[in-house]
Amino acid sequence: MSENVYPKANEGGETAHVAPNPSFPDMEETVLDYWDKDDTFQKSVERNPSGDHSQNEFVFFDGPPFANGLPHYGHLLTGYAKDVIPRYQTMKGRKVNRVFGWDTHGLPAELEAQKELGIDSVDQIEKMGIDKFNDACRASVLKYTNEWQNYVHRQARWVDFEHGYKTLNIPYMESVMWAFKQLYDKGLAYQGYRVLPYCPKDRTPLSAHELRMDADVYQDRQDTTVSVAVKMRDEDDAYAVFWTTTPWTVPTNFAIVVGGDIDYVEVRPTEGKFAGKKFYLGKDLLPHYEKELGENYEVVRELKGSELEGRRYYPVFPYFAGDEAESEGHVPGPNGYTIFTADYVDTVEGTGLVHQAPYGEDDMNTLNAKGIKSTDVLDDGCRFTAQCPDYEGDFVFDANLPILRNLRAGDGPLAEIPEERRAILFQEKSYVHSYPHCWRCATPLIYKPVSSWFVSVTKIKPRLLELNQQINWIPGNVKDGQFGKWLANARDWSISRNRFWGSPIPVWVSDDPKYPRVDVYGSLEELKADFGDYPRDKDGNINMHRPWIDNLVRVNPDDPTGKSHMHRISDVLDCWFESGSMSFAQFHYPFENKEKFEQHFPADYIVEYIGQTRGWFYLLHVMATALFDRPAFKNVICHGIVLGSDGQKMSKHLRNYPDVNGVFDKYGSDAMRWFLMSSPILRGGNLIVTADGIRDTVRQVMLPVWSSYYFFTLYANAANGGAGFDARQLRADEVAGLPEMDRYLLARTRRLVLAAEKSLNEFAISDACDAVSDFIDVLTNWYIRNTRDRFWNEDASAFNTLYTVLEAFMRVLAPLAPMEAESVWRGLTGGESVHLAEWPFVVDEKTGADTELGRVLVDDPALVDAMEKVREVVSGTLSLRKAAKIRVRQPLSKLTVVAGNVEAVKAYDDLLKAELNIKNIEFSTLQDAAAHGLKIVHELRVNARAAGPRLGKQVQFAIKASKSGDWHVDAASGAPVVSTPSGDLALVEGEYELINRVEEENATEAAASVSAALPTGGFVILDTALDADLLAEGYARDVIRSVQDARKAADLDIADRISLVLTVPAVDVAKVEQFRDLIAHETLATSFEVKEGAELGVEVVKA
C-alpha cells in the first residue's frame, strides 16, 4: 500500500487550491504534457518484465489503418477500446507492447494517388509509368501520419509509433511472400477462372467478404427487368419465358434452369399481341403477367419443372448460334440452349425460369456442370468486345437500352434470326433492388468471369470452425452467430488484383505454352538464387514493388530451345492478404524473430468493429489456420457502429455529428472515452453520438469524481487552522473501530474493485463502467452527503477513509478515464503516475488471500445489505417528493417504511430523517402492514405495438391474460409469462411493463399520502400534508440555501463566520424569527438582522 500522505498544501502548488469546476480539456493538456516530459508510457511498458519465454507479456494486435485519410469517430471508438485493456493489464503487472501499424497498399492508396494526380483510368496509369504512379502511391499513403499521431495522442491512447510496422516495408513484404509460398506448397493457393464481383472502374475483382463488411456496399439501384420468351425447338408456337435483371447479359444466354419440383403451366393468350402463342411460366407467378396474358387466357396444361428438363430452344442473339457454335469445342457447344433443373430456382419473383449466362456465380457453375462452354464478351473495362459487334465498345450498363430496343422491335442483330425462331420481349419493367457497389470507389459492380488466384478456404473450413470454438468473442453470440455462420458458408478467397501498388504475387510462368512451367518464390534469397540478384529500383535499392520485380526475367529451364522465358504474372496481392498476415509479418517471420513470434502468437486481445468479422478478424483466422493450425487471437471485442445524431450513418454533408476536435476542446477526451466505453456499442449494438450525451457524461461522471476530490482537499487543506490534515491510508487494525458509514464505503470500494476486475478480465469494458457509475453515486450522493459534519469537525477516520477510498478508486478509474484519474491520483499522493501504480488488488491472484489493501477494504454483507435498503428507501421517497412536487428542503411530518428486515433499516432512523427531511418515521414488517390493509399489487401492461410484430394474433390473448391475472414472472429470466389458448408465452424486453403498486384500504389516509414499491421488496408511504410549522421551517431552509449561495458568491472560506442581514417579505418575517437559531447555526452567522422588504434579499459580510 502507498506510503504517501495528504496534503501537500503547505508545499503550495495545485493541491493547495483545487478548482471546484475545472476545465477538463485544460487539465488533460496538462496531463498529456506531463506524460510526454516524464516518458510515462515507455516507463509503464518497461516497468514490467517479459518473464521467461515472454510468459508475462500480454499480446495485443493493433489493426492497421490507412494513413491516407483522416481519423473519424469509428477510429476514435476503437482506439479507446484498444487503450483500456492494455492499461489495465499493465497495472496488473503484465508487459504490454503496443506497436502501431499502417496499411499502405491496395486500391484505397491507388485511388487517393489517382485523385492527387488528376487521373482516373488504368490506361493513364500505364501511360505515365508504373514506377512514377507507385512513387505517388508511396507518397500519399502516409500523408496524414502526423494528424493520426496528434489525434491518437490527444485521446490519451498510448501506442508505439517509433517501432510501428508498414505493409510497404521490404521485411513485411518478404514475410507475405513467404506466406503465399507456404499456401501454394500446401495446395491452398491456386489459380482459377471464376465469376467474381468486379469493379469496372478499378478493373479488378473483389472478394466475397468485401461485399459483406459494410451495410452501405449494397445500395438501391433502379434497373429494368426483362422477361424474354425464347422459341422452343420441339413445339410449334411454344415459348419458354426467362427473366433477368441484367438485360446486357441476354446476348450470352446459353441455358435456362427450372425447379424440378416447381409447378409450371403452359398458357395460351386468346387476345392481344401474343394471342395463339403458348408460354411456359411458373404457376405461382402468373399474376405478375396478367397484362401480357390478357383476361381469358387458356391453361393448356400443368407440369413439373422436371418435365421441361432436356428440352431445347433457339438462341436469342445470333452471336453464338448455328451448327458450328453448337458443335463440340465451340461456344456454347452441343449442350447449349437447353433447359436444366437446379435447386436454387424459386418463385419469389420473375417467371420461375432462370436465365443462365457467364455473369453469375450459380450460372457459371451450372454451365460448367452441364458441359456448356462459355465466353466473356467484355473487356477489362466492362465494355463489349467484337464478339458482340452490334454493341462493341458499349459499357455494360449503357448497352441495356440498345439491347432492349432490339428485343422490343426484333431488329438489329435479332433480325438475322428467322422470325419463326426469333425470341420475343414478353415484358419489361422498372425494378428497384439492392445492388452491390465497390466499397472503394462506389461504382456499381458486375459479376464477371476472371482469372484469379485463390486461397482454398473451403479445404480448411472444418478446421476454421473448430478453431473458432477456442476464441472468446465479445459479445458471445458472434462466435456461432455472425462469425460462425460466415465461416460455415465461406467461399474460396480471391487474392489477386489486376493493379499496381501492392505486394507482388511471387509467381513466374513460361511465356511459351509449349513449355509450361510455374515457379513460386518464398523469399528474396530464392529470387536471387534463380535470377542472380534481388529486385532493385533505378537507384539500386532492393524494391519488391512493380515494376522493379517485374524486371526479374530468366530463361525457362524446361525449354530445351532456350527461347522461352519466365515472367512474373502482373497481379498484386489483395491488401487484405497483407492485413491478415500482420501477426507474423510484423516480426519479419520466419526470416527473423522466429522465437519472438512464437512467443507472441496468438494475440491475447484484439478489437475492431463488427464488420471485421468478414474482414480483418476473418482473414487473420484464415491465415493462422492455414499456416499454423492455430487461432490468431484468443479474445476479441466486436463493437457496433457509431451513428450520427439523426440515427443515420455519419456524414460530413449532413453534419449529423459533433466535430471530434470540438468535443475535445469543449468537454475533453475522457468524457468522450467514457461516453463510448460505457455504451451498448461494446456489446455489439450501435450508438448515436450527440453533444448532449457527451455533456451528460461530464455532468454524471467527470464532475462528480472531481467534486469528491475537491471536497476532500477543501476540508483537508482547511483543517488544523489551515495547516492541513495529513490524511493517510487506513491500517487493517483500524477498520473494525470505524463508524458504520466508513465501513460501508470501504466494503463498497472492495466490491467496486472486484466488479471492475472481473469485468475487465472478461473484456466487458461497459460493465466495468457500470460498476464505476454505481460507485460514484455511493461515494458522492451517499457517503459525502452524509459525512460533511464529520469533515467539518476534522474527524480523522473520515479523512483517512475518504483518502484510502479515493486513492484506490483512482487506480480503478485509470484505464477508463486516464487523465482525470492521473490528475486526482497525483494530487492525492504526489506519486509519479497512477499508470505506474499497481492495480488495487484486494485478493492475491496467486494465493487467494486478502492483500494488505484487501484487509482494509473489508466486505460486510449485513452492513451493505442494510445500507442498500436504506438507500432504496431514500431513493423511493425522493421520487415520491418529486412526483408530488414537494422540494426536499420542505420538511414533512411522517414516512412509513415497510420492509422484510425492517429492524436493519430502523437502525438508521436518524440518518433517514436527516436525508429525507422527515419528522417521524414509522417502521413496519410486511405482515403487520398487510394486517392494516397495506399491500403491493403487481400489474403487467403489454405494449401491443411493440409485441404485435412478433406475436401476431397472440398479442390479444397476451393483453387479456395481463388484465385477468393469468401470468407469472419466470424465476430464471425475470420476464413475464402469459397464459394463452396455445400455451404459455414469454414476453421479451420492450413488449411489456411490470408495475408494482401499493394499495391502501383506508381511502382517507391514501388521499393524504403517496406511496411507492421498493425494487427489492417492501414499500414506502409518504404523508404529504403540510401545516404552518412545516411550511415555516421549509421557508427557513430556503433562506439557508440563499445565504449559502451568497457565501459562495462572496468567495468565503467554508470556515468563515459572517454578519448576516436578511430582507424578508412581511408575511414571512415570523417564519424567519421562528427558526432564527437554525438559520444562524447553518450559515455560521455571528450577527443576524432581519428587515422587511418586497422580496427575499441576502447580505453577507465576513465577521
Curated annotation (Swiss-Prot):
The cross-references to PROSITE patterns, in alphabetical order and at most eight, read: AA_TRNA_LIGASE_I (PS00178)
- Tell me, what does this protein do in biology? Catalyzes the attachment of isoleucine to tRNA(Ile). As IleRS can inadvertently accommodate and process structurally similar amino acids such as valine, to avoid such errors it has two additional distinct tRNA(Ile)-dependent editing activities. One activity is designated as 'pretransfer' editing and involves the hydrolysis of activated Val-AMP. The other activity is designated 'posttransfer' editing and involves deacylation of mischarged Val-tRNA(Ile).
Task: Please give the catalytic activity noted in the UniProt record.
Answer: tRNA(Ile) + L-isoleucine + ATP = L-isoleucyl-tRNA(Ile) + AMP + diphosphate
In the UniProt record, which is one GO cellular component term? cytoplasm
UniProt feature coiled coil, ranges: none
Quaternary arrangement and interactors, per the entry?
Monomer.
Give, as one word, the top-level EC class.
ligase
Where the record places motif 'KMSKS' region is 649-653
Query: Example GO biological process term?
Result: isoleucyl-tRNA aminoacylation
Q: Could you give the domain comment from the record?
A: IleRS has two distinct active sites: one for aminoacylation and one for editing. The misactivated valine is translocated from the active site to the editing site, which sterically excludes the correctly activated isoleucine. The single editing site contains two valyl binding pockets, one specific for each substrate (Val-AMP or Val-tRNA(Ile)).
Motif segment ('HIGH' region): 65-75
**CDD domains for this protein:** Anticodon_Ia_Ile_ABEc, IleRS_core
Q: Spell out the residue ranges making up region: Disordered.
A: 1-25
- Any idea what this protein is called? Isoleucine--tRNA ligase
Superkingdom classification of source: Bacteria
Query: Which cofactors does this protein require?
Result: Zn(2+)
Q: What is its EC number?
A: 6.1.1.5
Q: Species name for this entry?
A: Bifidobacterium longum (strain NCC 2705)
Q: Family, per the entry?
A: Belongs to the class-I aminoacyl-tRNA synthetase family. IleS type 2 subfamily.
The family database entries (Pfam families) matched by this protein are listed as:
Anticodon_1, DUF5915, tRNA-synt_1
Any idea where this protein resides? Cytoplasm
